[in-house]
């Protein structure tokens, strides 16, 4: 099913659907008129003699050089090919499809001056599954994501490389096999296509969506760990969180209450438990995970604005003037990526402490050492906990802010840059690590709850444990563990663990 986009009001929900489902996107036809109007204005300038940046001048530090009208098409071609300087592995295909969709939104605002032909080609590539090969490295997140977007644009011209029908082909062959025709760029079109924040924004959105999925799963595993440790649900009382007032904290506490409702384990120790308070990793879940939820929601609003923005340069304004500005600078995206990294780091940190609690007989309230049957003969989940610590610590190192590291480029014309692109790209690795941590908690918590038999956990958590056990059986004796850890991580990453509980329990990304 094709997702129809209305530039200026595209929602996080639509963007998440594009990312997770791979459905193609197209612009609503009502935006064609604005695109055509801006394109006509650019064509008018290109036919004249007055120099206007990006239309009939050089670029960056070469902006003062006037280009002959006969060379305008060559100028755009040279711009794209010279800017194809990306290095590293290709970006994931679902990220590239999101990049292309965001570029559609930006062009659809009618301020870029491209012909409708380019919009139709991007739509056609999405519909037919032509995905440009975009190397992951090469952007500093200012003057747009120039190098990576040049690789996207090169395919539209019949250059570069693209994935199509499971093959990696040269751009011309991919278009031909898909029944699409490459374009010859007209005035400003190359600049409009590469001068934007769509790569950084798509990567940040991918990080956001993945972080939120992991955050939801961590509430399930956190509630499960609470029952496994025979922790108290009293700290999740709604009045406590209403008195503080943070919505993420309120929503997280409500989710934990919903997940634990009906637990026989919980009821068994409400009265007469000699422990006065649980460790913070159990008791302060609403405060920590709730703060992360608030942060992700705030970042979501920033990225939703950016996803609907026009970020190339110069721009065709509503009065038909063409004005140079700096919307290509991705500082808001860089800040957003840094904040997501902090949330990812903290969700993993508190999850890892719950894992450590459950494998430690001094803290786990009667569970065997390392959750092993016959500890000593079996090591149980001893090294799974160590792996979770390794993943947590790697995320701590990766969470250093990227946005504070500017460097001058392009002969000091572009003398302050955002570093948004690699700041956002690291979120893919960080969320992979987080999926691994939460997956390990799923294994430790499920094993811990099973040791409490015949006491039963809640109906919701029983469903979650059944989902875990559908991919990883109970650990009765030591076995090769790497496959178990991967299966648990994949379960979290796929969203299947979240889908195992009632849909209305887990807090959404949008308030």
UniProtKB/Swiss-Prot annotation:
Explain the post-translational modification: Contains an active site 4-methylidene-imidazol-5-one (MIO), which is formed autocatalytically by cyclization and dehydration of residues Ala-Ser-Gly.
The UniProt entry's GO biological process terms, in alphabetical order, are: L-histidine catabolic process to glutamate and formamide; L-histidine catabolic process to glutamate and formate
Q: What Gene Ontology terms describe what this protein does at the molecular function level?
A: histidine ammonia-lyase activity
CC annotations in GO: cytoplasm
Q: What class of enzyme is it?
A: lyase
What is the protein name stated in its UniProt record?
A: Histidine ammonia-lyase
Q: State its location(s).
A: Cytoplasm
Pathways involved: Amino-acid degradation; L-histidine degradation into L-glutamate; N-formimidoyl-L-glutamate from L-histidine: step 1/3
Which HAMAP family did the record assign? His_ammonia_lyase (MF_00229)
- What keywords sit in the KW lines? Cytoplasm, Histidine metabolism, Lyase
Q: Which organism is it from?
A: Rhizobium rhizogenes (strain K84 / ATCC BAA-868) (Agrobacterium radiobacter)
Task: Kindly list the positions at which 2,3-didehydroalanine (Ser) occurs in this protein.
Answer: 143
Gene3D superfamilies per UniProt: Fumarase/aspartase (Central domain), Fumarase/aspartase (N-terminal domain)
Cytoplasm: is it a keyword of this entry? yes
List, alphabetically, the InterPro entries matched.
Answer: Aromatic_Lyase (IPR001106), Fumarase/histidase_N (IPR024083), HutH (IPR005921), L-Aspartase-like (IPR008948), Phe/His_NH3-lyase_AS (IPR022313)
The record's family statement is:
Belongs to the PAL/histidase family.
- NCBIfam families documented for this protein: hutH, PRK09367.1
**Signal peptide start and end residues:** none
Its domain of life reads Bacteria
Q: Does the keyword Lyase apply?
A: yes
